[in-house]
Structures are given as C-alpha cells and as structure tokens.
Amino acid sequence: ICKMPRQSGKSTTVVSYLLHYAIFNDSVTIGILANKAQTARDLLGRLQIAYENLPKWMQQGIIAWNKGSMELENKSKIIAASTSASAVRGMSFNIIFLDEFAFVANHLADDFFSSVYPTISSGKSTKVIIVSTPRGMNHFYRLWHDAELGRNEYVTTDVHWSEVPGRDEAWKEQTIKNTSEAQFRVEFECEFLGSVDTLIAPSKLKTMVYDE
C-alpha cells in the first residue's frame, strides 16, 4: 500500500512493474483498476506505449490489443476497468493494481473487496498493489493505519514530496501560493485530513484517530 504525493511517478512505476510481470510470467491475469474507467484505460495506454518501446527481443506476440485490455502470446492478460465495473467480478487475478483508491466511494470499495478479494487471497503468489494520495479519513486511511500497526498484511511505502527531483522549499512556497496550505498538506504532504467543508475543523478530526 503506497501513500504518495501528486505527480511523483507512482502510477508509471507500478505500470512498469506490471509490464515486466506480464512478459516474464506465462498465463497470468493482471487487473488495472481505478476510480474511473477512463483513468484505468489511460494507465493501460501507458503500459502499451512502454511495451512498444521495448527491444524487439523482449516483446511477446500480441493476441489482443485495445483500449480496455491486451493479451500477449504467452497468454498473459492485462485488463483495465473501474473498481465498480461488473466485468471484474468473479475473475481470477494474479495481481490487482488499485490506483487512487482513496477516491473510490466507501461503499464501492467495500463491495469491491467482498467480491474480488477472495479470488486474490486464494493464491499463494498473488498481489494487491494499492496506490493513492490521501482523501480524508476513509477506507484508504483505515487500510494504511492498520498496515502501520501490523493488523493486515499490506507493506507500507511512502514518498515525501522533497524526494521528487526539482521540488524544494521554494517550489513548496510557490505551490501553496497558487493553491492553499490545506490542499498542499493533503496532495503533497499526504496528510489524512478530514473531509473539507465540515462542521468540525479538519485539524480537530485528525486528533480523533481511528484505532479499532
């Protein structure tokens, strides 16, 4: 489970790993799922561009190639869809990549895990990769918090905005001027602030930590 700031290369890095996995493992099924189907297709598009730029000796033959899925000669498939799509229900995946999972509605996230996760947990080498920027104290916060406390099996990975080349204090000040400090704290500091425009201030909500 990855908590990372905007424009830090998180999605591109995971997509590169998925491409490597599909090429060097036969008959695997990979799901690229996002809060919107178009976002998932865009990620698949990046993977397809990366594939086209591989050396010829690394490229598999292509069986299927379209905006929503691709299949290689080694029978490995990559499918792009929204987390709410009925198309992914009942399918068996070797890897599921959940992009910007914090932006999926809570009820859809719960429904997704109840219907799709059993197909993942049944395998010995299957993986779930969750990547997102925080968005309040929702299901992503709960998964992250539980992972930090060792209550689930996810391994936490985070990146500070200052680790991204070209981002320094001057960049931070300029970004805050152009947006707001609260927005910077969420999208770049990756803080789990409460929902915006609430009766209770986000700073107060932050002290009311989920711990059950």
PLM feature spans:
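ASCE P-loop NTPase helicase motor core
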Residues: E52-N53, Q59, F103-T179
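Conserved SF1/SF2 helicase motif Ia
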Residues: Y21-R41
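Walker A/P-loop
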Residues: I1-Y17
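Catalytic P-loop NTPase motifs of RecA-like helicase/translocase cores
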Residues: S8, A40, V88, V104-L108, ...
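Inter-Walker segment of RecA-like/P-loop motor cores
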Residues: R41-N94
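Conserved H-loop
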Residues: M4-Q7, N35, T133-R135
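ATPase catalytic-site recognition across NTP-hydrolyzing enzymes
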Residues: D111, S162-E212
